[in-house]
């Protein structure tokens, strides 16, 4: 069973990602990369949904597509809202280009691990390609 601290870290990732593009939870298309197994993901998402229901009763959380296998890099997380580029202060050696598409969102993972996004309301975290799981979340006002 995931600990409270583990969930808190997960929630902070979501919250900080919203804040760094200045749009909050009210309207967000967000891609979160997690190295959690499916049982833990279900646990975290239920906790997140419960929080959203308490805080914002009009919010809806949609779990959409599992794309591939990657892991979040949490160290020294920083985001530049003007360029929509998030970095961690650590380099990642990735030999191939990774692309993800979801609706209007199109993102590319470059060879040093920086993710860039061409959508105004999306930010994507820098990642390590480690283990299989990409959860795509669509959070918006109904």
From Swiss-Prot:
Keywords linked to the UniProt accession: Glycoprotein, Signal
Looking at the keywords, is Glycoprotein present?
yes
Signal peptide: which range, if any? 1-20
Q: Which residues get glycosylated?
A: 80
Protein known as: Putative uncharacterized protein DDB_G0280709
């Amino acid at each position: 069973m995931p600990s409270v601290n583990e969930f808190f870290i997960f929630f902070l990732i979501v919250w900080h990602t919203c804040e760094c593009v200045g749009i909050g939870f009210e309207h967000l298309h967000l891609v979160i990369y997690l190295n959690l197994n499916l049982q833990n993901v279900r646990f975290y998402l239920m906790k997140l949904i419960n929080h959203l229901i308490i805080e914002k009763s009009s919010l809806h959380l949609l779990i959409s597509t599992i794309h591939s296998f990657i892991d979040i890099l949490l160290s020294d997380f920083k985001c530049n809202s003007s360029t929509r580029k998030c970095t961690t202060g650590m380099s990642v050696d990735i030999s191939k280009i990774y692309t993800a598409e979801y609706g209007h969102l199109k993102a590319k993972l470059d060879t040093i691990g920086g993710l860039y996004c061409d959508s105004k309301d999306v930010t994507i975290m820098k990642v390590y390609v480690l283990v299989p799981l990409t959860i795509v979340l669509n959070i918006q006002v109904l």
